[in-house]
UniProtKB/Swiss-Prot annotation:
Organism of origin: Schizosaccharomyces pombe (strain 972 / ATCC 24843) (Fission yeast)
Lineage start: Eukaryota, Fungi, Dikarya, Ascomycota, Taphrinomycotina
Role summary: Catalyzes CTP-mediated phosphorylation of dolichol, the terminal step in de novo dolichyl monophosphate (Dol-P) biosynthesis. Dol-P is a lipid carrier essential for the synthesis of N-linked and O-linked oligosaccharides and for GPI anchors.
The protein's name in its UniProt record: Dolichol kinase sec59
Membrane topology (Lumenal): 77, 179-187, 237-263, 348-373, 425-440, 484-504
Entry keywords, A to Z: Endoplasmic reticulum, Kinase, Membrane, Transferase, Transmembrane, Transmembrane helix
Protein's cellular compartments: Endoplasmic reticulum membrane
Length: 504
């Protein structure tokens, strides 16, 4: 356990030293951080008036506010990991799913564990307590194992907070998969993240070490990796998913598309995606050839930002019109595409011929400083996960039910984040001191989400939501986007989803 605490500490320290964003002076309290704490700790619970949150057992989740408002200058900085690794997951669990959810007690202990893990960044002796907790609980031991494996695989690609937050979600997926009977689409998702990915990584590492020891040629090593990866996916992952589904995955997938009662709708969705992707590729090729962006943007940073946000716009066209048509199919599609993205990223990292170098050169043109910290290029994966999280969470809570909450990922990232970034960088004059984002960008985020959400209701894309509820969700999420230094693609969709559950 001490090894894990030290690894987490070293990871967070190294990433914080290399971080390029505006540094926050924790010696002095600022209004932006207070607003961030209030947004996460209080707004969802105040909106969720039917819950009795203020209990002694939940007092630990108010530690971020206590540390920031009452603590000395040496411990003020602990508020952020406590807020995002313990209080925020608990907010999702308590407000989003409720005390009667099947995984409540397991995930409750994980939230407490994350709080202690955050405190070990300041007080190393708490690792002894973590060690005792990990050895006394199978659930916490699983969470510890997930964290160790994730940090080892990803190196410095994620910040400490991002890494532990993702591990918390993976641990919840493990609990749901191995402790309870899950739906077929969850079986596919667990097969992707818990079976295929770890085994592929271990296999490829073994092949690379063997090739280096035996001095095998690069071409032969590449062939070995492709062959054994395909064999492993076919034997291990396919067997797992087949056991969960009760039939061959390819047969099940064919039936889901062509023999389901919603087959016509699903075929239309696939055709729509093909049309959108075809048009996007055509526009992308033309723009690369003619380079028209220099006429409208004055710096390379603005051009890069606009090019990155075109993929956010693509997400809007791909998913916004179809999210509520067939939530079950969207859940399945996101799970499949996530596996493809991760598999392609593996090819890029290993530079496997003939596609590895080509993929790397293409993706590298769209990277920023966050993609340069470790071996992974994560921006496009983050975008996909951010759009998928509300659909995954809603499916776990209610099943495949058409609802506005399915759209919040696309709204936050495709509309809000894109407009906030483009407007803020181009026209922003009034800067927020903590994050260097602009107030103009915050307003652009809120207005764009609000207007697009009302347009979707006007065109009957999704069920209706009251005017004040829409305004409140868009404004609160925009404020959090403006004052938080955490990754927008990860936290904003989950936060807006929680607000919807609190107001529902």
């Amino acid at each position: 356990m001490y090894i894990m605490s030290k690894k987490c500490y070293d990871t967070s320290e190294k990433i914080d030293r290399e971080q390029e964003c505006v540094e926050v002076n924790y010696q002095h309290r600022n209004f932006e951080s207070i607003l961030e704490i209030f947004s996460v700790l209080f707004i969802p619970f105040l909106c969720n008036s039917g819950k009795k949150f203020l209990q002694i057992s939940n007092a630990s989740f108010f530690l971020p506010a206590c540390f920031y408002l009452l603590g000395s200058s040496s411990i003020i900085q602990l508020y952020e990991p406590l807020l995002w690794l313990s209080s925020f997951p608990f907010c999702i669990l308590y407000v989003g799913f409720g005390e009667n959810s099947v995984l409540y007690h397991e995930m409750y202990t994980v939230c407490l564990y994350n709080a202690l893990l955050s405190l070990t960044q300041r007080w190393k002796w708490l690792s002894i307590v973590l060690d005792g907790l990990g050895n006394s609980s199978v659930n916490l031991k699983l969470h510890e194992t997930v964290i160790l494996a994730f940090l080892e695989i990803t190196q410095n690609s994620f910040t400490f907070i991002e890494g532990i937050l993702i591990c918390t979600g993976l641990t919840g997926l493990c609990f749901a998969t191995f402790s309870y009977e899950v739906s077929p689409v969850v079986s596919v998702l667990s097969g992707v993240l818990l079976i295929s990915l770890p085994t592929l990584i271990l296999l490829n590492l073994c092949i690379l070490k063997l090739a280096a020891k035996l001095h095998l040629s690069a071409l032969f090593t590449t062939c070995l990796i492709y062959f054994f990866s395909a064999l492993l996916v076919f034997l291990v992952s396919r067997s797992w998913v087949a056991g969960q589904l009760g039939q061959a995955p390819e047969v099940w997938l064919f039936n889901q598309i062509f023999s389901h009662r919603n087959s016509l709708t699903r075929i239309k969705i696939i055709i729509w995606w093909i049309i959108c992707l075809g048009c996007f590729i055509f526009i992308l090729l033309r723009s690369n050839r003619n380079n028209p962006l220099g006429k409208y943007f004055t710096t390379e940073d603005e051009v890069l930002n606009f090019r990155r946000k075109t993929y956010h716009a693509l997400v809007v066209f791909l998913f916004l019109p179809v999210c509520c048509l067939d939530p079950h199919f969207l859940h399945l599609s996101f799970s499949g595409v996530l596996f493809i993205f991760l598999f392609v990223e593996g090819i890029r990292i290993l530079r496997l011929k003939p596609f590895g170098k080509m993929i790397h050169e293409f993706l590298w043109e769209y990277t920023d400083n966050r993609d340069h910290k470790g071996p992974l290029i994560i921006s496009h994966i983050y975008l996909l996960i951010g759009c998928a999280i509300p659909i995954w969470l809603s499916n776990a809570l209610k099943g495949p039910v058409a609802s506005v909450e399915l759209l919040v990922g696309v709204l936050c990232l495709g509309c809000g984040d894109s407009m906030a970034s483009i407007i803020g960088k181009r026209f922003g004059k009034h800067r927020i001191s903590k994050t260097n984002k602009s107030i103009e960008g915050v307003f652009a985020f809120s207005i764009s989400v609000f207007l697009v959400l009302h347009l979707t209701q006007a065109f009957h894309v999704c069920p209706s939501v009251t005017f004040w509820k829409t305004l409140f969700m868009s404004l609160c999420t925009a404020i959090l986007e403006g004052v938080s230094t955490e990754n927008d693609n990860l936290i904003l969709p989950m936060y807006m989803w929680v607000l919807y559950q609190a107001l529902d």
